[in-house]
Regions:
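Short amphipathic
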Residues: 326-327, 382-383, 450-452
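Feature captures C-terminal
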Residues: 46-49, 59-69, 156-163, 167-168, ...
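C-terminal motif of bacterial Sec signal peptides marking the signal peptidase cleavage site
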Residues: 17-18
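Feature marks short, surface-exposed loop/turn motifs that line or immediately flank catalytic pockets
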Residues: 200, 245, 359, 363-367
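Glycine-rich phosphate/diphosphate-binding loops and the adjacent beta-loop-alpha structural elements
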Residues: 376-396
Length: 592
């Protein structure tokens, strides 16, 4: 898919209207601390609004309307003498046909127009690999971070990460426009913006594209950078980080008891001295937060451009923060538990006392990207879905099962197929299936890998996944029945209807992501050299070829139903036998 976009990479960015340009940042790569500067005094109190987005995943269609919301907030702050700071918490590009064709270039163009001040570096920012059609390096000359560096060069705002390090030297990376932090001035207020990346980055992107890098603990890195920025005169510190949590209750911002404390964000905040950070814009978990945690205002706003987060800080004339209002995520169109309406059907109403109007300049950027993708998107694949085919991250699903079946049809040399719940990104709607819909369900340009392993290895993969939380493994041509016996999990497995032989050798079709260490799937098996063979065939496109040949109607109820399960286990994952784990030691879970 990346080859289809090569012709647009040399286009120059449009000249932006002055009213939408972000405050010009002063990037930092941790130079020596500067002498403390006195806060700029103002004749009166000022309101600073921080708007946070996260995990856009290429959902360009949502940005013109979002720009309308931002414009209304900017107008309100301009009227009262305050200002607006717009930041993103990462995973900007990967996920839609219109974004992936240009390796995220149109997202950068739109963000430039919107006036972002900074963006965090998410794990999926590494997905595109080198500039060009390949998602991994083909030779030593290929830069496995080439596409990411190209997007940073085009951005009028920095990509910030304080904890992304060179593995060999232990020093922070020194790539153009990718500093640890930036300092901006908004309405006379000096704001330090610090970035951070999730500790799971090495195994939640293509591992080969992350070689030579490592992630340092985010808390100490943020604290060190905050001290430097405070010393340089920052009155407010904002963290934008591709790590987060999830909270069930958004009605009580001072009560985070409904939030998942096992997620990375709580450890990071726990490592920060009191008063280090004022606002924390989170991401990665595709969930919602609007809470005050350890005196830090924390926001996260789902994913795919459905909503945005907001914090209003009130600053005294001497520059110190006197209070804040944490807003719940502002859903811009439709309802969260229903499919997103098309932009033309959105009726956002008023916000900040005036109608929300999509921004025409952002709309022009989006329309251009959509037009390039339109022909490919609308291609009919020859099959009709009798009902919606749903995905699931943590449980067996019709979509996961179907995709594994299609993988086996494309690779008849394999006996089983496996994919991960994190790779399923969208449901498939009922009706004639189009390529664009398939793309959004499986947007990653992962290639086929064939893994030779023993039946004992397969049993370990199935058993381990059942006993862990996080992403489910979906299987093709494999069924398992798991029950607790004598305080241990007994798993009976069949392949092609026959009992699994622990001593036999099987060929497993999977993705190069999982085969190369993604999600930690194969790392514990200690497979011999030569057991993994990676091809140049993109899984999604091979699946599309199978569908074009098969045609017909697909019934999701035959792929998965309570009575048609490939993974038969009691209760919910993680399956536990015997005494439950001790309190205070939550299981680690993979994230989006």
């Amino acid at each position: 898919m990346k080859a289809e976009a090569s012709y647009i990479r040399g286009l120059a960015l449009a000249v932006l209207a002055a009213c939408s340009v972000a405050p010009q940042p002063a990037p930092s790569s941790r130079p020596a601390a500067q002498p403390t500067q006195a806060p700029r005094l103002k004749p009166g109190a000022v309101t600073l609004t921080i708007i946070g987005t996260n995990d856009l995943h290429g959902a360009l269609e949502r940005l013109p309307l979002f720009a309308g919301f931002v414009a209304n907030v900017r107008a309100a702050r301009a009227a009262d003498g305050g200002g607006v700071l717009l930041v993103d918490a990462g995973d900007m590009f990967q996920g839609t046909l219109e974004s992936n064709l240009a390796e995220g270039a149109d997202v950068v163009r739109a963000y430039n127009q919107l006036g972002y001040a900074a963006a965090a570096i998410g794990n999926h920012e590494f997905d595109f690999g080198p500039v060009g059609p390949r998602v991994t390096p083909a030779s030593a000359e290929d830069d496995s971070r080439g596409a990411l560096k190209a997007r940073a060069a085009e951005a009028r705002f920095p990509f910030v990460s304080a904890n992304l390090l060179d593995r060999d030297t232990g020093a922070r990376i020194r790539w153009p426009n990718m500093p640890a932090s930036a300092m901006v001035e908004v309405a006379g207020v000096k704001v330090g913006i610090i970035g951070a990346s999730t500790e799971s980055t090495p195994y939640t992107t293509m591992p080969v594209n992350f070689e030579g890098l490592t992630i340092a603990p985010a808390g100490p890195a943020i604290a060190e950078e905050a001290r430097r920025l405070r010393g340089a005169g920052a009155q407010v510190i904002v963290v934008t980080a591709h790590l987060g949590s999830k909270c069930k209750d958004l009605e009580h911002p001072d009560d985070p008891s409904s939030c998942d404390r096992s997620e990375e964000l709580f450890k990071v905040i726990g490592d920060l001295p009191k008063g280090t950070v004022d606002v924390f814009v989170a991401g990665h978990t595709h969930a919602a937060m609007a809470h005050r945690i350890s005196d830090i205002a924390v926001i996260e706003s789902y994913s795919s451009g459905r909503a945005f987060g907001r914090v209003d800080l009130r600053l005294a004339p001497d520059g110190h923060v006197t209070g804040e209002k944490i807003h719940q995520p502002q859903v811009m169109c439709g309802e969260l538990d229903k499919p997103v309406p098309p932009p033309a059907a959105c009726q956002p109403g008023d916000y900040e006392g005036r109608p929300v109007v999509p921004d025409p300049a952002v709309q022009q950027i989006v329309d251009s990207a959509l037009a390039r993708a339109a022909v490919r998107r609308s291609e009919k694949l020859g099959v009709t879905l009798a009902k919606r085919i749903t995905k699931s991250y943590g449980t067996e699903s019709a979509e996961g099962n179907w995709f594994c079946d299609l993988m086996l049809a494309a690779r008849p040399d394999a006996q089983v197929a496996v994919t991960n719940g994190g790779g399923l990104r969208a449901d498939l709607p009922a009706g004639e299936l189009e390529y664009g819909q398939l793309f959004e369900a499986i947007p990653f340009d992962n290639r086929f890998a064939i893994v030779e392993l023993t039946g004992a290895d397969l049993r370990k993969l199935v058993s381990t996944n059942l006993q862990r939380g996080g992403a489910i493994l979906s299987w093709g041509n494999l069924a398992a029945k798991a029950r607790c016996k004598d305080d241990r999990l007994d798993v009976a497995i069949t392949v092609g209807g026959r009992p699994l032989s622990d001593a036999a050798t099987y060929k497993m079709a999977t993705s190069d992501f999982l085969a190369s260490g993604g999600d930690g799937l194969l790392g514990r098996l200690k497979l011999p050299d030569g057991a993994i063979k990676v091809t140049d065939v993109i899984i999604r496109d091979a699946m599309a070829d199978v569908l074009r040949q098969r045609k017909g109607t697909i019934d999701p109820d035959k792929l998965y139903a309570p009575s048609v399960r490939r993974l038969d286990y009691e209760g919910a994952r993680p399956v536990e036998c015997g005494a439950p784990p001790k309190a205070g030691k939550p299981r680690a879970e993979a994230n989006e």
